[in-house]
Amino acid sequence: KTGSADFLLEAGADIAHDRSLLKSIFEQTGFIFLFAPLHHSSMRYVMPARQKIGKKTIFNLLGPHTNPCSARKQLIGVYKRSLVETFSSVAKELEMEHVIVVHGNDGLDEISITDDSFISELKDGKIKNYHVSPKDFGLSYGNFESIKASSPQESFEKVSLAFAGREGSVQDMIAINSAAALKLSGIVKSMKDGVELSKSAMNEGLAQSKLESYVKMSNNL
């Protein structure tokens, strides 16, 4: 019911920027958010039909592979276990550099904290499939209700607490997925190291500071 765009809007960010402004925001903050309807010019024409259908369609699968930045490295979450290896195979055909495709056994299109997760990782032209659990990273299994957000406001409140250093399932969920992105970027060698770095960033206020600088910059251009 609530996604990344909803969260950023609730945080006070302006996400309706063209490419030139996005470049400036990225250069000054190291972060940007690309609101799909503004950057997939062809996709905007099918949005009304998708909303009327009310179910997942082929367009849910096309999005990650039509990244407007032509990203060579990507973390992709999929909503069905059967799609994980399909996505990594497509990434290989597209000759992408490093891609991590994830699916939680509880049905989440993310690495889950409430259950084990399946991952298909493409790197240097080779695909490796494996399972991970929260325990692999020194974390405990969480409760699904504790990470669920039924509104943008609830999502913002939960993330704000995690960014303020409150440990628990929400912070763990953020850390375990951030870890995959940190591994992709080459900042850490393992996801376990990524979890530790991500938690430190939240507990030391760095994540909150980054969010605030992005929100401020997005409104000043």
Where would I find each of the regions flagged by the language model?
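Short, structured segments at the rim of ligand-binding sites
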Residues: 1-2, 7-10
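Glycine-rich anion-binding loops and their surrounding alpha/beta cores
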Residues: 9-16, 21-221
